[in-house]
């Protein structure tokens, strides 16, 4: 890694050991912000480690110090904050902050954690170290994928461009909606990695996936709707790397990463002996699963040869008698994080919002400048470029870009015209980022 090493030897371990869960009331506080910055550093370091294939020290540290359950709890806590507290801010008419970056950091926290989990859950020992919280994580992924299917039935994800008349809080709401789409796609990858461990998952987790949530049928719906693909102007586009990209005609038969994740998850859930012993093939499930036959083309089988086993399974399924829903009396563990957090904070959402409005999200200009400096130090440009999956894209038109905003050095553009058109939206954050650089 050389010069691209973000964390010094020993520094990553200190950051991992310091990870802890925060009450919802403390989200956005100074201590919480410090942990958010630490998570971002761990996130970028984990991606760098995976990119250069020099072991996975971040993943090993998370397992060694038992911090995967902490990440899962923080993930669900910020999800609850976004559902219960953030809407209260948006309804307060006289709350018009000069800068919404402190709130944006909390909104973005969920994306930071799910991105880190996606990077490290590739390794089975990480899934195993989640212990009982894997149940909570399965529920979380199910919530996200259910919303993804529902959204695809209502016209797809929101567009990133905002209205000229929108105020900062309305703009933040739109950013949060777009972020939800990206988070759901990350949750799909995490779920697929959990299914890779199907042979070592507890019976309670298997039952949750197969009986409570019927994930195979939900995955079939995802394949049918393919929310990460769309047609624009007669051209096929796919969502990858936080942007929509036009797919060249010669590449359109190529299996996308997200479609591949769905197929692998289906393979794991339908063909592993452990899952087959737990999955009840009702007439509804049989009808849904047989829809997969239309997708199993020769082109797909050439790219994922193991799906030939799934094709044989479906051929056998056509001749199989369906089963009535099982009504076995079984003692099982249930997810507890969401329920516990809701019980602890029930009836307090308004009070939490009021406290945070007064003490957290109304910082002085000096506090904002100090925070901007810390952000600039966290998001080092050389590291961001190293972890980027491809060449930068224009912030306005998504074409390949070669020019960077001279003031903040954060946004990329393909030409001067696009930069001018994007300024109305970008200018709000550009000034603060530039102040952070000057404050160094």
UniProtKB/Swiss-Prot annotation:
Question: Is the NAD keyword given for this protein?
Answer: no
Listed result of changing residue 16 to G: In CILD22; no loss of interaction with DNAAF11
Coiled-coil segments, which residues? none
Q: Which InterPro entries match?
A: UCP037948_Znf-MYND, ZMYND10, Znf_MYND
In the record, biological process GO terms are: cilium movement; inner dynein arm assembly; motile cilium assembly; outer dynein arm assembly; positive regulation of motile cilium assembly; protein localization to cilium
User: Where exactly are the transmembrane stretches of this chain?
Assistant: none
Q: Which PROSITE patterns match?
A: ZF_MYND_1, ZF_MYND_2
Q: Annotated region Interaction with DNAAF11: where?
A: 366-440
- Pfam families given in the database record: zf-MYND
Which residues participate in Zn(2+) 2 binding? Answer: 405, 408, 426, 430
Residues that, per the record, bind Zn(2+) 1: 394, 397, 414, 418
The observed outcome of changing residue 379 to C is:
In CILD22; no loss of interaction with DNAAF11
The record's disease note says: Ciliary dyskinesia, primary, 22: A disorder characterized by abnormalities of motile cilia. Respiratory infections leading to chronic inflammation and bronchiectasis are recurrent, due to defects in the respiratory cilia. Patients may exhibit randomization of left-right body asymmetry and situs inversus, due to dysfunction of monocilia at the embryonic node. Primary ciliary dyskinesia associated with situs inversus is referred to as Kartagener syndrome.
Complex and partners:
Interacts (via C-terminus) with DNAAF11 (via CS domain); this interaction stabilizes DNAAF11 at the protein level. Interacts (via C-terminus) with DNAL1; this interaction stabilizes DNAL1 at the protein level. Interacts with DNAAF4, HSPA8, IQUB, RUVBL2 and DYNTL5.
Primary role: Plays a role in axonemal structure organization and motility. Involved in axonemal pre-assembly of inner and outer dynein arms (IDA and ODA, respectively) for proper axoneme building for cilia motility. May act by indirectly regulating transcription of dynein proteins.
The Swiss-Prot or TrEMBL record describes its family as follows: Belongs to the ZMYND10 family.
Q: What is this protein called?
A: Zinc finger MYND domain-containing protein 10
Organism placement in taxonomy: Eukaryota, Metazoa, Chordata, Craniata, Vertebrata
